Amino acid sequence: MKKSACLLAAAAALALVATPAAAKPWITLYSAPNYGGHSIDIDHPVRDLDHHDWDFGDRAQSARVHGHWLMCAAKNFEGDCVHLNHDTPRLKDYGMNRRADSVRPE
């Protein structure tokens, strides 16, 4: 009985170690449909894609998505917004073609 309890505890500890941590969300925005043109990789909230570090406001036409992201047509996550949780070769299909000004993981 005691041996079974020790084995069970060891198995539980191993399962905790072997479980991968949740992957960090990221999104890659592309300036052309079907993942073409210039691209930027983002792994944190960006309130203003026009900011000098990004200079990508109103340019995105497609996106590769890992995790869940909110994409909004105005700065500071305002205006029309869409939820993205999969690769999107044509943001036009979501009404966001060349409109994204802010993005954040959810």
Write out the residue ranges for each language-model feature.
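Compact beta-sheet-dominated domain cores in extracellular/mature segments
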Residues: 2-106
